Amino acid sequence: MLRKMTIEDYEALFAMWSNTPNMGLRSLDDSKEGISRFLERNPNTNFVAYEGEILVGAVLSGHDGRRGYIYHTVVLPEYRRRGIASSLVDMAVEALRQEGITRVCLNVTEANEEGKKFWLEKGWEKKDFLGFYSKAITDKENRQLFRVQP
């Protein structure tokens, strides 16, 4: 079953993220409070997939009014190659389109070969001419990674 994500999905969602290789999680942004804030700002653009009571996939996406962003897309390994990720992404992109967004961006860690292949197969383009820059604007404690699986 595919449906909109709610904060009630958080514990299962965080467990899935934590056990996914190459998933970088930030202590502030990916905390329950951080995700709750994100869902309040983007209530219609995040989706989960359940098989019975088991969370098997999710997409976290939102926008700033100009561009859409996909932050985390994950499907449990034993449920991959069934079209779940594609369906979740399609739902997120359509939700962003309905909110007036005309371009969606995402980042994939260089080590995530399976992820890079997925996005290319879905018709996304890698923009080699862009550099990705980031600056934390909070204290060091809140910027730490929960964990990045190798």
What feature does the model see in each segment?
Residues K4-H72, A95, E99, K127, ...:
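Acetyl-CoA-dependent GNAT
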Residues T6, L76, R80, T109:
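Residue-level recognition of the GNAT/N-acetyltransferase active site
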Residues V75, R81-E94, E121:
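Conserved acetyl-CoA-binding loop-helix of GNAT-fold acetyltransferases
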Residues L96-V108:
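Conserved GNAT acetyl-CoA-binding A-motif
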Residues L106-G115, S134-I137:
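Conserved beta-strand-loop-alpha-helix junction that forms the acyl-donor binding cleft
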Residues E114-K127, F132:
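Short acidic, glycine/proline-enriched helix-loop-strand junctions
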Residues D139-R143:
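Short helix-loop capping/hinge motifs at secondary-structure junctions, enriched
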